[in-house]
Amino acid sequence: MARQLISAIRFIHSFGYSHGDLKAKNVLVRSEGGVISLYITDFGLVHKFMRDEVHAPYTPGKLCLHRGTLPFISEDSHVGAIPSRRSDLENMGWLLIASLFGGVLPWSKLSGKSPVLRAKQSAKQMISSREDTVLKKMMPGQSHKRLFLYMIAVVELEYEDEPDYDSLEKIFEVDV
């Protein structure tokens, strides 16, 4: 399902839009004939990050400040920058931890936007330093390993970067 979610996000991004509020309520799953299909809904916080093939600049501000569902929004959204491709993919990582992989986000019981932002920044710094202990604490069993590789790729993205969606999808391929 992670691969389908990346594919759906890629489709949205291909039109120059970011979703800005990925959460479990905004991801519908349908099973028919043994085939699982995933759909992203609720485009109320969608943003146009690309106009005439020019990416919006990274400009923190009040326009988009903390918009979205607090436990899942990206650092970009916390500081008020227009959500970009990187933002949606970070958002997806937190969503996967809490929803698909049955983990617990360290900031889920924090109140206030600033403490949540600081906790996310700390987690991202540990991921960037290749310390997987932060994800081990969030997630049961071995499921953190693939997500750790995914989150490394995401935290290494610059605001305007176009992600390598194929590589991100391959992280979640099931070994046969």
Predicted features along the sequence, with ranges:
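Catalytic-loop of the protein kinase fold
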Residues: H13-S31
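Activation segment signature within eukaryotic-like protein kinase domains
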Residues: M1-A2
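Activation segment/activation loop of eukaryotic-type protein kinase catalytic domains
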Residues: R30-R67
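Terminal C-lobe "cap" of eukaryotic-type protein kinase domains
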Residues: V155-V176
